[in-house]
Amino acid sequence: MNLETLLALPRNLKKTFFVIHDILMIFVAFWFAQSLKVQYSDEWLSIANWLAFGSTAVLTIILFIRIGLYRAVTRFVSIRVLTSAAFGSIISAVLFCLTTLIFEQKLHLALPIVYFLVLVVGVTSSRMILRAILTDHHRKQMTPVIIYGAGQSGRQLLEAIKQVNEYSAIAFVDDNPKIQRTVIYDLAVYNPNEIPMLISRYGVRKILLAIPSSTPEERKDIIRRLEAYKCEVLTIPGMKDLVDGKINVSSLKKISVVDLLGRAPVAPRPELMSADISDKVVMVTGAGGSIGSELCRQILNCRPTKLLLFELSEFALYSIDKELRETQAAQGSQVEVVPLLGSVQNKERLSSIMKAYHVDTVYHAAAYKHVPMVEFNTIEGIQNNVFGTLCCAQAAVDAGISTFVLISTDKAVRPTNTMGASKRMAELCLQALAAEPEQKTRFCMVRFGNVLGSSGSVVPVFEKQIAEGGPITLTHQDITRYFMTIPEAAQLVIQAGAMGKGGDVFVLDMGESVKIIDLARQMIVLSGLKVKDEQHPHGDIEIKITGLRPGEKLYEELLIGDEVQKTTHPRIMTASEVMLPWTQLSDILSELHTACLQSDQNSLRQLLLRAPTGFVPKDGICDLVWQQNNKAV
């Protein structure tokens, strides 16, 4: 009968085995004690001895049941169980004295001491041996892990691990030399350089990061070092969850790209965050999108009087409205959240909303941002990105709005695709309106690159492909991109908007560009898998190069020209841009509008080339309807 079969036995049967075992231990203890005074074997067989033993055994088992010694038969033995066994053995020794005196009427002082020592050793050692066997059995079934970080959070994680049978922690690892070579909660603390030895000795397959207070740079450095060990790396939540006591095994998550690419945030300046928001009516277009929804979260924290959520998608509007109301309930916020459906191309709808609610500030995040989708649907992209922005801006002027901030993109810089060119045209519209005489609305625009976790980002695509076993598809092995976290981008947009004087083009410092193929490799390795390539044909995940998509750039730029000026904020700059006065731009816009109505793709392209957008298309016309109509018959 193997251990699995024994563990599967009914609970009452396992209790019976322990009762029988303890009766045997009582007999052994009784025999050892009596052997000190019994000289001949026939005395052992006396009725008095058997009556004394039987009485002691029955009373002791009843006592053990009463003190709960059999409640945790198959569990690991705790100090409480061992204490109960010792206490029960002491009482049993007293019972031994009483029964011996009753049935034999003579008792040596050494007898109960010997009885107690033999019984307590027999009862507790069997349970400790069981604990060792079960621990070893469960450990073989569990995944051996290393906890990186022996501080308070690492210790909390260890306690959480002990509550489940999924992981077996074999060691702590910590960068602090002061606690290396110490033992914490029965686990030794090792130097990070000893990780290869631990992996080899114990077959470690996962490393759990418990360093929530580390800086982004420190996390990146640790994660890059761990990449060499081919183990899956998981991490606990941030400090907020730690403070709230929410650390548990289920809260462990895979290393996110934010951990790989994140940087130390610059604390937002309160006066800039609140300047256009606090005690004002704020409207966000595209409120249900990646950037729009984060803007709403940040704005809510700055306590406007009203927050207007303007969104075309009913479901997206429902989702962000529900989330914000739940946040308000938790925080006790009194901000009035107003969910409004509508299109940014409907100027009358926009104007009526802005006037009805006396809007002070508009953050215009509504746009079509996916390069291939706009390339395949050129007219809709231009109508939404160019004329949608123009409608919003003109409605803002009509309603006497104070501040209008356009969320732009790095793809507007020397664009090679229609999406980028349309966003540059949107910028030109705001620049022209800002330059109008006696303009009361302060227009500005903020450019930045890719945000981590946004819809259409490579990151969730790669995560899905890795989860499905690959391959990861990449358009070009040399493609690079700038990345920023969504919260940081939203905070910088708000602060840049407060710094604008009118017609400003702000550029956010995106840090260093990232080679996407390196990012893909990191994500594979940190998932505990291996890259499959010519050098490693037996790897797990292959990276396939599919070729650049229509309008896609290898490299992205954030600035036009060399006249870049710093601002008072270390991560916000301004760029000097070519612009057209409204009298000239309006003619181009009129022709562009006519071309859209007539579905004239050739004229659309020529107009985008004629305007000072820097548009250099790398592909022919990719609009799907146009291509269908122009197929050779």
Where are the model-predicted features located?
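Signature of alpha-helical transmembrane segments in polytopic membrane proteins
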Residues: M1-Q141, Q180-V183, R205, L209, ...
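A solvent-exposed beta-alpha-beta segment
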Residues: L36-V38, L130-D244, L312-S319, E326-A329, ...
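Flexible, Lys/Arg-rich cytosolic regulatory linkers and terminal tails that connect or flank
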Residues: P192, R219-V281, V397
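NAD(P)-cofactor binding segment of oxidoreductase domains
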Residues: K220-L234, K306-S313, A356, F376-T403
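N-terminal Rossmann NAD(P)H-binding glycine-rich loop of SDR-like oxidoreductase domains
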Residues: V282-Q298
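Conserved Rossmann-fold cofactor-binding substructure of NAD(P)-dependent oxidoreductases
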Residues: L341-T361
